[in-house]
């Protein structure tokens, strides 16, 4: 199986494969015996697609047959179309390249939609292909008929039904172009009697060299000069980075050193620098820490690079702020900014490095760095081996830290949504080569395994660790069979607390006792793994965790580690308010009264 480096790249991505570029620039027009399905497969392969995720169905038969005959694209059949969409979203989020998923007519397409929101909300290029009822039967409430354009209108940046083979080549080109340039979902509905039909014109999509990620946008020189003036005048500067700064992080580190500035990050940007980098202070908000929050508040100037951080309640309102983003519409929409610059982070930072003056006063950086040491020490205290390692359940902080300690240097962590996000976001420490993905902006429970399968399919030799709560894992439990069937060696760690943990915390924060629906019984996840033909492990105490963690991570195929964690453990808040303490206390009193049969 090809590794990441083996996949053909577009010239814009600095590929050495000039032969590949030549193929893009000079497509071959084949005989008119080519079908719409065959043209689509050829196009996808030419632009670098190597897997397609989906569930087979009769409306897709001509397409899946074209994939089978072509043999260059791997079909990965999933157990639920949402899993296909999540797998494609995971690939696209990790690589920035187009990924593809499929579902058949009606319900198959419906099931894709929930997973496609993962790509929409995290701005990842995904092409979704759905079958459709025969064009001649549309409009008469035919079996499984729906309105695909209406169904996909919100989730997709582009959605189109191909009703005539003559339009197929141009529409396919447009769909891929829109997925890249809108950084989101493009959807094609192709009726059963169209996808297998012969093309009446050119059999290849022209101008494939235009189908690539958006080029960088150079910001206006005058605005960068203004930003440099503000930075030079500020006594202290903090830099806040998001995923839009990923490709420029090395230059940002140089800028931070020149300005004696701490660098803060969003959750999605957590993996951009090693956790122990001297300027890497930490995150903000609940999946962050007090040092980052305080640095952002106390700096005389905040420089925001490539971030549209959505939680405005954690952002300062009185700090002088410069925001740089190539999406001009996000400037100033979360907080007031003094200077908003439309442009890509890379060229902006390059220009700033040439124009800003180096700062020699290290007092602010040293103060923030000392705060980081204290905060990390607090986190460490919650992640040590307990005095009695044979006593369970296991603290989730300890589990997350041990995963961090034992993971491969280039491991990919895929974290589900819920309280598991807090444990992994705060206690996993990444080396710089490791990656961490989650449902960053969709915040959907049950998305981690599907995304993990997609990422693992890119490179079956790279370690992929899925961290999920028991509730989230059971939502798409069948996707573990996808991993087994297609030999995707994902390692699934189940944070088993027998409840919807984050919902429980939110109830208590509001002063409410836990609702009975917040708790549930579980199956034996280790036995389930064995029933699927994989390996399963269980840990109920820290000692057992130490015993099984090595064999679990070394398992040659997919595996599940079922870890019984302490359900009552509370996350560490950056700043706790008195009313939160009061509400938690009242909730615990109410829960105790209910358990004793008293009034709620």
Give the predicted meaning of each segment.
Residues 130-171, 190, 215, 269-371, ...:
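Glycine-rich, acidic loop regions that bind phosphate or pyrophosphate groups
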Residues 146, 174, 178-233, 383-384:
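Conformationally flexible catalytic loops at phosphate/diphosphate-handling active centers
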């Amino acid at each position: 199986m090809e590794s990441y480096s083996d996949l053909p790249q577009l010239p814009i991505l600095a590929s050495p494969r000039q032969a590949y570029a030549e193929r893009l620039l000079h497509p071959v027009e084949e005989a008119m015996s080519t079908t719409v399905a065959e043209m689509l497969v050829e196009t996808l392969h030419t632009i670098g697609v190597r897997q397609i995720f989906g569930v087979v169905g009769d409306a897709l038969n001509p397409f899946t047959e074209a994939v089978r005959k072509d043999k260059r694209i791997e079909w990965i059949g999933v157990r639920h179309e949402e899993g296909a969409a999540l797998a494609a979203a995971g690939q696209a989020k990790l690589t920035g390249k187009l990924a593809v998923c499929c579902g058949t007519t009606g319900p198959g397409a419906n099931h894709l939609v929930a997973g496609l929101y993962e790509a929409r909300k995290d701005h990842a290029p995904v092409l979704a292909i759905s079958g459709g009822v025969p064009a001649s039967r549309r409009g008469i409430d035919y079996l499984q008929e729906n309105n695909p354009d209406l169904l996909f209108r919100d989730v997709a940046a582009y959605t189109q039904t191909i009703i005539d083979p003559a339009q197929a080549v141009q529409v396919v080109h447009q769909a891929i172009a829109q997925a890249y340039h809108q950084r989101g979902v493009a959807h094609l509905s192709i009726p059963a009697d169209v996808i297998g039909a012969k093309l009446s014109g050119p059999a290849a999509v022209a101008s494939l060299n235009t189908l690539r990620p958006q080029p960088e946008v150079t910001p206006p020189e005058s605005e960068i000069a203004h930003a440099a003036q503000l930075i030079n005048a500020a006594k202290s500067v903090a830099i806040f980075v998001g995923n839009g700064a990923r490709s420029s992080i090395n230059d940002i580190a140089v800028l931070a050193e020149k300005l004696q500035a701490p660098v803060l990050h969003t959750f999605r940007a957590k993996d951009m620098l090693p956790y122990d980098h001297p300027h890497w202070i930490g995150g903000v908000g609940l999946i962050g820490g007090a040092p980052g929050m305080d640095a952002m508040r106390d700096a005389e100037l905040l420089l925001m690079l490539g971030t549209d951080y959505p939680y405005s309640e954690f952002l300062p309102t009185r700090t002088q702020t410069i925001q740089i983003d190539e999406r001009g519409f996000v400037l100033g929409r979360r907080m007031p900014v003094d200077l908003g610059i439309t442009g890509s982070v890379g060229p902006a930072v390059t220009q700033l490095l040439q124009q800003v003056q180096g700062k020699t006063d290290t007092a602010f950086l040293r103060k923030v760095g000392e705060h980081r040491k204290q905060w990390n020490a607090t986190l460490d205290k919650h992640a040590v081996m307990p005095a009695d390692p044979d006593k369970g359940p296991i603290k989730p902080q300890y589990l997350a830290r041990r995963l961090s300690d034992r993971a491969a240097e280039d491991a990919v962590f895929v974290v589900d949504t819920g309280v598991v996000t807090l444990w992994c976001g705060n206690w996993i420490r990444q080396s710089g080569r490791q990656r961490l993905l989650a449902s960053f902006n969709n915040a959907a429970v049950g998305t981690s395994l599907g995304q993990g399968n997609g990422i693992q399919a890119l490179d079956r030799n790279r370690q992929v660790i899925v961290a999920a709560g028991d509730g989230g894992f059971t939502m798409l439990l069948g996707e573990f069979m996808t991993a087994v069937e297609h030999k995707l060696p994902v390692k699934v760690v189940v944070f088993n607390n027998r409840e919807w943990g984050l919902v429980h915390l939110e109830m208590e924060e509001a002063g409410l006792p836990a609702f009975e629906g917040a708790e549930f019984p579980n199956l034996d996840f280790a036995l389930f793994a064995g029933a699927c033909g994989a390996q399963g492990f269980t840990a109920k105490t820290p000692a057992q965790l130490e015993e099984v963690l090595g064999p679990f991570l070394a398992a040659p195929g997919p595996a599940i580690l079922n870890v019984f964690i302490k359900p009552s453990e509370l996350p560490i808040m950056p700043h706790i308010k008195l009313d939160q303490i009061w509400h938690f206390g009242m909730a615990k009193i109410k829960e105790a009264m209910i358990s004793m049969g008293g009034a709620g």
